[in-house]
């Protein structure tokens, strides 16, 4: 099962990914949390570019796609194949939103990611940019060049407009506990279908 958590910076993706993983592991489900860009060579190169000189949007797309292909081949597909729950803190919709906000065609970006397995549930944590930026400052970080009100507004608009069948929008202006409860309920809906009668005990524990 593949769970992707998306949203603009400051939406609470990392917090939710950790909370969901803790809950799922607690009821005996093998769960892996990963992120994009990854800590692999391509993801590392992308982060280094912020210091050594930014890539162009087209170059960033190339590096992101290389990073994602490796991620899919080395972790996502193998772990799903063994029956694990894979939780991703950002996935291909982030590239579509952020590079789309930089002016690249959204349809072309989606097509370039056709190789990436589609999530069973895509949790879009929706917050206004002003709240996302406030949270970034509150956690002691300094917003990067992507993290401006104007740019995050464009990204948010693209996230909300994306037509992906598994997308579920969660109001992430609420507190972390409320967001977690909403997300867990959506994940349980998918697990109920996936596990069937055999998963009754697991679902009962998750609901407890």
From Swiss-Prot:
- Which keywords describe this protein according to UniProt? ATP-binding, Kinase, Nucleotide biosynthesis, Nucleotide-binding, Transferase
Q: Which InterPro entries match?
A: P-loop_NTPase (IPR027417), Thymidylate_kin-like_dom (IPR039430), Thymidylate_kinase (IPR018094)
Quick one: a GO cellular component term? cytosol
Entry-linked Gene3D superfamilies: P-loop containing nucleotide triphosphate hydrolases (3.40.50.300)
**Catalytic function, reaction form:** dTMP + ATP = dTDP + ADP
- The residues that hold ATP are 7-14
Q: Could you cite one Gene Ontology molecular function of this protein?
A: ATP binding
- What Enzyme Commission number(s) does the record list for this chain? 2.7.4.9
Q: Name one GO biological process term.
A: dUDP biosynthetic process
Q: Which PANTHER family match?
A: THYMIDYLATE KINASE, UMP-CMP KINASE 2, MITOCHONDRIAL
- Stated family: Belongs to the thymidylate kinase family.
Instruction: State the protein's purpose.
Output: Phosphorylation of dTMP to form dTDP in both de novo and salvage pathways of dTTP synthesis.
Per its record, how is this protein called by name? Thymidylate kinase
């Amino acid at each position: 099962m593949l769970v992707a958590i998306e949203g603009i910076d400051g939406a609470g993706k990392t917090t939710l990914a950790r909370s969901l993983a803790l809950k799922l592991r607690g009821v005996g489900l093998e769960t892996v949390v990963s992120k994009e860009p990854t800590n692999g060579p391509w993801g590392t190169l992308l982060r280094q570019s912020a210091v050594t000189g930014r890539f162009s949007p087209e170059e960033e797309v190339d590096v992101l796609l290389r990073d994602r292909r490796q991620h899919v081949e080395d972790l996502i597909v193998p772990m799903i194949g063994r029956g694990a729950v894979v939780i991703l803190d950002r996935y291909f919709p982030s590239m579509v939103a952020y590079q789309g906000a930089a002016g690249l065609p959204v349809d072309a970006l989606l097509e370039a990611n056709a190789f990436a397995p589609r999530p069973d549930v895509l949790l879009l944590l929706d917050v206004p940019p002003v709240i996302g930026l406030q949270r970034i400052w509150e956690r002691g970080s300094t917003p990067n060049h992507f993290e401006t009100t104007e740019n995050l507004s464009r990204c948010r608009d693209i996230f909300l407009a994306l037509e992906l069948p598994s997308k579920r929008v969660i109001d992430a202006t609420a507190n972390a506990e409320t967001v977690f409860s909403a997300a867990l309920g959506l994940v349980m809906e998918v697990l109920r279908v996936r596990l069937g009668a055999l998963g009754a005990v697991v679902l009962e524990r998750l609901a407890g």
